[in-house]
């Protein structure tokens, strides 16, 4: 082994070997249990971020552990075509490089351009996945627009259409006026803005008056421009001010349209004026009110979100209607929406109908990619009827076929699924799965897998011209088929039979509706087991939190706080990090602030920590469902942990290579080896660690599994066991040394196997050196060795109790040395009043170890009632440990030192008490700051008690 641990020199070579040798593939023995995980497919346009690194570490740890248990494991990998994101990247690229738009290319040529770009640049994220050590089967890599998944997507669409679960309808969608497409709720970013609430007077028609004699009612709106499309005013049916007006009419200003007053609970008596203008074609709530009250829908906006030259009028079912005029006043025609807003407010003021304007805090929806305000827009789109699909999907979770970890996410799932809305699946893009629907010249629609199939099925003559629908499917539609589409469905393939359903889905809670719920619905509808029962896509949904920065803020390019996992693996200098964070910004004005913060936080850039340290940090922070505040100090700590494991392994190898470790002994001879108490203890401790580690993984508590490894390797194996072996290896008999060498190398080998799922690289690298020294190890890689399980035969509770007593004895001596400032190297005489024969036997059996590790010249067991000089004392269990102090310390100097410490500590206590007694400080300081001060105070108070006790002891000497 190299003297120092250098992850850069081992990681990529090892990964290449693993991949070339095919270790990531399922072993194919179908008599063994199968275990599969389907990776959430990252966007093909993307690069690895901390969220990916976090989830991929969790998945790889689970898959490596199950592979080591002998299961037939598949970690299915692939990428998503990411419709809107990919199309925008390529549109920006051709605009910057060629000054062209997609229309200059035309649809087919532009799509070819995207494929070309995908083949050139689409591999970034898969290269980065390899850097993380992801043991996915690369030979089975899939892409959501490859031939197989495209065929599966088409098949699902056609079948759902034939079952009347897909329809085309005119409904309200989130419309991006810049990108000219419908977008999902996930692509809408709601921003808090300061705005206004305009109060308009709407005149009552036909001489009607309100209860207090007014000939108008007042409506409040934040979007005056939409009043051109109003088709009603809603009041609460219980509102005494207006209930008599229900059924009466308003003469809508500017357009002079008669619209009804309807009673609807959407109108809140306590909010605003209690009267709500209803624009069903331009507001989601109004759309529902309109449906309930049979109000027509008037669309006044173009796809650019300008005012139309003439309105479109529809019934609540989306059919063209002549119930209202389509006329729009000439001055508004073609006007930009926000310009129209100002003009309408001005006209209301001219008409004497502007009651008042109030400041108002608003939440405004923006398209997260187009960056403009989204409009609710009435458009023709394709929809999935989700209610019939949702029913079995809810039952699967209720019945425990699918479990959520943590369980509280089930409630979020139920809340959404029990109020599920039809799903808009069409997008006005070019890149994606084109909808398999064709229209003839009369507008009649035909759905089929191909145009040939459509013609054949409907007996259409060659002269009948068919035009395919221009829209593509929502990316989430094909993603919903991921668990079964990747395994060869609609064919009943061996892969589908073996690896479906998958074991666990690791996902963020933010896509529980967009992806998780839809996968459950689609899979249960299309995939059946041999008995014809619906299959679930996965048995467990493991919900992770978000990875935030050290201050708890979400990582984003605009905040300049994004950390690239690869930079933590390889390191990055400060100037490159600044350039990375400040270059190509959508909001360049933020660059200065971001540069300042980056230089302050990372004065020397980021060191290379290696993949294993990053993985261990992510695992150690993975408490289920909670957001994680990233902490570079923990990353540094776990890099030190990797160093510790490396150095400990070198110590073991130096003491076992070219030595007799008893490997050639028979099982009977081995049972009679002269193992020390420490040897037997570390074997027992390892069994406990194996038991805990496996239990934590089974419960998806990777944080606790990582903690078990850390505790065992750092504290028990390195800090204690290796120290306890030194007296034996230096002074023991040949038989004792042979036994200790045997235990050193076998426990190290088992420890490497136990840690491998979390720390794949360092464990493989060390294991290759350890393997030749251990009897009975076959195979070329640690990846396919057995994951250690608890073996009761190797566990001895009495041994653990005895060694814990020995540790307590040594720790007590070390603490007394520190307390009384006695040099660690100074030999001491120790006396002990034993509580019972067991403790006396422990001393007798372990004198060599106790004397060696505690640096003792003599251990004297006192007889009952034996007089003792002035001593520093400590309890070990119920036995009393004493160090005679005469000649060990300068009493006067020590008392003077302690007096100084006491004075300093009292000063700190007084200062903090003054701070906490200051009402101004307590009122203004954040709760966390106050809590920290209280914690400091408690610490100083405890220190003072200890110092005063030491003063008493030394004064009595």
Swiss-Prot record:
Coiled coil: 890-956
GO annotations of cellular component type: cytosol
Keyword Iron-sulfur: no
Protein name per its UniProtKB record: Valine--tRNA ligase
Binding positions (ATP): 557
Entry keyword annotation includes Iron-sulfur: no
Motif ('HIGH' region): 42-52
Gene name of this polypeptide: valS
Gene3D superfamilies: HUPs, Isoleucyl-tRNA Synthetase, Domain 1, Valyl-tRNA synthetase, C-terminal domain, Valyl/Leucyl/Isoleucyl-tRNA synthetase, editing domain
Substrates-to-products reaction catalysed: tRNA(Val) + L-valine + ATP = L-valyl-tRNA(Val) + AMP + diphosphate
Protein family per UniProt: Belongs to the class-I aminoacyl-tRNA synthetase family. ValS type 1 subfamily.
Keyword annotations: Aminoacyl-tRNA synthetase, ATP-binding, Coiled coil, Cytoplasm, Ligase, Nucleotide-binding, Protein biosynthesis
Function: Catalyzes the attachment of valine to tRNA(Val). As ValRS can inadvertently accommodate and process structurally similar amino acids such as threonine, to avoid such errors, it has a 'posttransfer' editing activity that hydrolyzes mischarged Thr-tRNA(Val) in a tRNA-dependent manner.
Domain notes per entry: ValRS has two distinct active sites: one for aminoacylation and one for editing. The misactivated threonine is translocated from the active site to the editing site.
GO MF, any single term: ATP binding
InterPro entries: aa-tRNA-synth_I_CS, aa-tRNA-synth_Ia, Anticodon_Ia_Val, M/V/L/I-tRNA-synth_anticd-bd, Rossmann-like_a/b/a_fold, tRNA-bd_arm, tRNAsynth_Ia_anticodon-bd, Val-tRNA_synth_C_sf
EC number, UniProt record: 6.1.1.9
Subunit composition and interactions: Monomer.
Principal subcellular localisation of the protein: cytoplasm
GO biological process, one term: valyl-tRNA aminoacylation
Residues spanned by motif 'KMSKS' region: 554-558
